[in-house]
């Protein structure tokens, strides 16, 4: 079976979202036979074969190319990542349904109206986008076979065509933390880490407040907060850390997967979303916590975790108060090291995109 994965993105292959959709497309290809991923290069279509890795650029506009593939080739499966709807998109969906193509439409964060408006610096643009979504939604739902969602709120409405999945990762290349290297001597430094693009709803200002409250130590143990990535939120964190006089905050900048592999052995816990209420959510859907788990690092979050095994997650209060750093430290020190050594295996089995997509498509 031939599949197309369609994502209205014009991004570098090094960016996190592109890596995610590429991993999803590769997993679909393994599940159904073959898959091409269609993204944008400017206004035109950019096509990558998941089997060969070959990249080509079409002279056709993004959705025009997709429409031609539907009408003129033997595409049998179409997976579309949510984009700002248009009449051209509806034309694509209608053509796919007419040809009997199985059509899965993904909303990567559901519901997303509140998040779009809250995290946007230009509220009027976000409101305009949401209004367009509302206008086109009945037509989108009419033509799709399944609605694939990663749910961020337990209160979200459920539709009959809806299938829930979790975020996943391409597990190949992710090296697990080596717990055989753990020092048997009493710990001298406890290290927390936050990786990736950060937004205000990650709530790491609460960690800074907590570190100030405990003077960056628990008893005789120094506490460090490591931040990997770049964003305007990280710039705000740097300024806040300086204003608070914090000395144990380490900003690493952007790192490759290989560089992260070398760093992870020193991290004790990974921080997910600590202020989910800022995006009207109560489920942590971030990719960062999936990667923490798959690397064998336990997670701190203010919401529900997708990991089925609850031993490796600490849920803190979802508010604006300082996070209790001692609570995090106590959680970590009470974890069994032998169990932690199994965390990566458990997580990679649950969060492998190959496993997620095979289950989604084949049931």
Q: What is each residue range found by the language model?
A:
Residues 4-6, 183-202, 208-211, 225-226:
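Conserved donor-binding/catalytic core segment of Leloir-type glycosyltransferases
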Residues 14-15, 19, 202, 258-263, ...:
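Nucleotide-sugar-dependent
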Residues 16, 320-323, 333-363:
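A charged, aromatic-enriched C-terminal amphipathic alpha-helix characteristic of glycosyltransferases
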Residues 87, 94-98, 105-115, 124-147:
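Membrane-proximal helix-turn-helix segments that form the acceptor-binding/catalytic region
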Residues 129-180:
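Donor nucleotide-sugar binding/catalytic pocket of nucleotide-sugar-dependent glycosyltransferases
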Residues 195, 223-237, 253:
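Glycosyltransferase donor-sugar binding loop
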Residues 235-262, 269:
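Nucleotide-activated donor-binding/catalytic signature segment of Leloir-type glycosyltransferases, i.e.
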């Amino acid at each position: 079976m031939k599949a197309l994965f369609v994502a209205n993105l014009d991004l570098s292959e090094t960016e996190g979202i592109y890596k995610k959709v590429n991993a999803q497309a590769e997993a679909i290809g393994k599940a159904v036979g073959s898959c091409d991923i269609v993204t944008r290069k400017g206004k035109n279509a950019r096509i990558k074969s998941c089997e060969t890795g070959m990249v080509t650029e079409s002279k056709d506009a993004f959705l025009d190319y997709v429409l031609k593939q539907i009408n003129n080739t033997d595409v049998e499966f179409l997976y579309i990542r949510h984009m700002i709807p248009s009449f051209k998109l509806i034309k694509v969906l209608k053509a796919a349904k007419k040809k009997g193509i199985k059509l899965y439409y993904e909303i990567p964060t559901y519901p997303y109206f509140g998040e779009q408006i809250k995290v946007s610096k230009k509220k009027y643009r976000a409101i305009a986008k949401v209004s367009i979504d509302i206008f086109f939604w009945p037509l989108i739902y009419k033509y799709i076979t399944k609605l694939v969602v990663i749910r961020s709120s337990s209160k979200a409405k459920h539709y009959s065509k809806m299938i829930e999945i979790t975020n996943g990762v391409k597990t190949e290349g992710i090296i697990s933390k080596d717990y055989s290297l753990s020092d048997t001597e009493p710990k001298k430094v406890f290290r927390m880490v936050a990786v990736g693009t950060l937004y205000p709803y990650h709530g790491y200002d609460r960690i800074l407040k907590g570190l100030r409250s405990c003077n960056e130590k628990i008893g005789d143990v120094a506490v460090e907060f490591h931040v990997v990535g770049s964003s305007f939120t990280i710039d705000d964190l740097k300024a806040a850390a300086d204003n608070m006089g914090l000395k144990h905050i380490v900003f690493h900048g952007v790192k490759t997967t290989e560089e992260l592999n070398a760093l992870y052995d020193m991290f004790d816990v990974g921080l997910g979303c600590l202020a989910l209420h800022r995006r009207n959510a109560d489920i942590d859907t971030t990719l960062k916590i999936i990667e923490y788990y798959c690397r064998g690092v336990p997670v701190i979050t203010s919401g529900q975790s997708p990991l089925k095994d609850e031993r490796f997650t600490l849920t803190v209060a979802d508010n604006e108060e300082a996070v209790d750093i001692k609570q995090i430290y106590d959680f970590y020190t009470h974890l069994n090291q032998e169990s932690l050594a199994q965390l990566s295996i458990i997580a990679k089995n649950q969060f492998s995109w190959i496993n997620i997509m095979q289950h989604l498509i084949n049931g």
